[in-house]
């Protein structure tokens, strides 16, 4: 009888069970992000960002961290660090190609729209791509090496940098989860205090909108829970009440223009002043500390509501 061929190593981690809950919440996060970027949408008054410091971005990045632990963890566990790093490198290359492809597709699509619609100025006005149009060859070279990260094209570069940190975190975590946590927190501290920055364009000091060294904290929080480096939180009434209280208190001061920002419910100057005072710790590009606390509180409430099998 012929021997059954051994499964190819590339297929091992792909066979790990997918958690449909992650796909659901990532899809929900993407849908909310879409609503947030639709101009003049009445639905944008009701997205999570209007009622708290964190928003759908945290949901998406956290779930991406958990999904990455499922997708790549087995490669590191069963075949070693180098094989796992190879899998990560392959994924980075896939995401990089998608990043370049989407940019070219957007340029082509909006360029065609401008040619067909007199007076339309999507590329310069809406997308702020004037520098690319003025020097396409130079800017394309800068774009390919992440020295030029235009508006709306910063999500995938952030994801690529965070993915590149996975082998480092795995090496540390396999020795001690505390080492991985210390490394992640140190990176976050450097980024959230503006000590670690990446420039988004060569002619100014504008940083990437999403600092990957700050946002890796929420990514690796999801990663750590899925890997088992972090235990499931205890189900305690006091902790639930504390989380609910924090969510309730943060809602009125979550936006510059008062409660719910753009809902047209009136502007309260005092709430706006409090928001401005809190800005260093709720800053989105550098993932301020209160954004993290708010997300953890929201996640804990969701965890409790989901029940024992949640």
Give each language-model segment a name:
Residues 2-310:
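Alpha-helical transmembrane segments and their immediate juxtamembrane cytosolic regions
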């Amino acid at each position: 009888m012929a021997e059954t061929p051994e499964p190819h190593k590339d297929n091992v981690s792909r066979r790990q069970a997918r958690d449909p809950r992650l796909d659901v919440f990532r899809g929900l996060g993407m849908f909310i992000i879409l609503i947030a970027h639709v101009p003049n949408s009445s639905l944008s008054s009701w997205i999570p960002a209007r009622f708290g410091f964190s928003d759908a971005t945290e949901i998406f990045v956290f779930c991406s961290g958990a999904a990455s632990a499922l997708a790549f963890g087995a490669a590191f566990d069963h075949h070693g660090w180098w094989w796992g790093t190879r899998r990560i490198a392959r994924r980075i290359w896939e995401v990089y190609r998608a990043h370049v492809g989407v940019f070219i597709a957007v340029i082509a699509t909006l360029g065609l729209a401008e040619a067909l619609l007199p007076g339309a100025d999507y590329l310069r006005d809406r997308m702020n791509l004037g520098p690319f149009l003025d020097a396409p060859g130079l800017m394309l070279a800068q774009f390919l090496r992440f020295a030029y990260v235009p508006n709306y094209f910063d999500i995938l570069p952030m994801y690529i940098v965070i993915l590149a940190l996975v082998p480092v975190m795995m090496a540390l975590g396999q020795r001690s989860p505390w080492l991985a946590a210390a490394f992640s927190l140190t990176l976050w501290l450097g980024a959230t205090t503006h000590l670690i920055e990446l420039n988004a364009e060569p002619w100014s000091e504008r940083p990437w909108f999403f600092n990957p060294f700050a946002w890796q904290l929420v990514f690796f929080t999801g990663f750590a829970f899925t890997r088992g480096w972090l235990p499931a939180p205890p189900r305690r009434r006091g902790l639930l009440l504390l989380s609910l209280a924090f969510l309730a208190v943060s809602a009125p001061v979550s936006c510059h223009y008062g409660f719910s920002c753009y809902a047209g419910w009136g502007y309260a100057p005092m709430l706006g002043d409090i928001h401005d005072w809190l800005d260093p710790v709720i800053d989105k590009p550098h993932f301020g500390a209160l954004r993290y606390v708010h997300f953890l509180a929201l996640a804990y409430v969701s965890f409790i509501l989901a029940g024992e099998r949640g």
